[in-house]
C-alpha cells in the first residue's frame, strides 16, 4: 500500500527550493529541483486509487484487518478486484456493516468496490491457497463448502452430499463440522430511533390502530346498542337452591284475624251453673231474651231489672233471679 507524504513536509521542501540558493542554482533558475519532481510523481500516483504498488503485510499468513492467521474454514484468504487479500470472516462482517443488499463490497484499504455473484456471495471470491499454512493446504476428506447467510448474519459450513459409493466406504466418519459463526444482523435490518424508516413504520402503525379503534366504536354504537334496546329480552333471574349446610328460617304461615263471635249456650234445667265462669253468667240473660218467642213476650209486662216474678224464683227457672236470690241470702 502506498504511503502518501504529509502536506507540511511538501511545503517545507518547496520553501527550501525557493529560498536563497548557491551560485550553481542561480545559473539555472528555471530548472525544477529533485524534491519537486518526487512530489509531482506522488500526486499523480495518488490520483487513482489502487494504482500504486501494494505493500505486502508484515506476515503474508495473516489478515490485514484482524491480524489472524488464515485457515481453511472461516479464515479463507479471499482476494478482491483491487488486489487486496482479507479473510472471509472480516469480509462478511464488513458486508453486514454496509448498507444495501450485499451485492458489492468495498475494500477497506482503497475503497474500490468489488461486485459479488448474485447467489453465491462472498464465498465465491477467488481464494489464495498460497497464503494458507501447510497443514491447511492439504484438502480434507469430505469437507463441505462454506456458506454465508447475510439475512441472518450467519457463516456456516454446509456438509457435503452423501457419496454414491459402497456402504463400506461410508463407515469412515468425517470429523464433525465446526459450529456456525454468528456475526450479527445486517445494517439494513437494524432499527434505530434516528432512522426515517423507524419513524415511518411508527406512523403507519399508529394510523392503523386509530382506524381499527374507530371501526370498532362505530359498530358498537350504531349496531350493538340499538339492537339491545329494541329487543324485549330481559335478563332472567334464576333462584338457586341453597347448599346443604346453609339453613334458612321457614316463612311464617298466615293466620286469619280473630273475630268476636257469640256462641249459643244450652238452656237445660239440669245444667250446673256453679261450675261456669262468672263472665259467662252475665251474658246468659241477653241470650235467653234473644231466644224467647216474641208471641210469648207480648203478654208479660215489662218489669225493672231488679224485680223478677215470684214463680220464677220458686221454680229456679230464671238463672238471673237465682243469682240475685243468692246475693240477698248472703247479705242477710
Curated annotation (Swiss-Prot):
Compartments where found: Membrane
Coiled-coil segments: none
Transmembrane residue ranges: 205-225
Gene designation per UniProt: Rnf225
Residue intervals of every RING-type zinc finger in the record: 63-111
Ranges of compositional bias, category Low complexity: 15-27
PROSITE patterns referenced in this protein's UniProt entry, alphabetically: ZF_RING_1, ZF_RING_2
Domain of life: Eukaryota
Keywords: Membrane, Metal-binding, Transmembrane, Transmembrane helix, Zinc, Zinc-finger
Chief location of this protein within or outside the cell: membrane
Chain residue ranges for the region called Disordered: 1-55, 121-187, 259-332
GO molecular function, one term: zinc ion binding
GO CC aspect terms: membrane
Membrane topology field: Single-pass membrane protein
Name by which UniProt lists this protein: RING finger protein 225
Biased segments, Basic and acidic residues type: 280-295, 323-332
Ranges of Acidic residues composition bias in the record: 36-46
The UniProt record lists the keyword Signal: no
SMART domains with a match to the protein in the record: RING
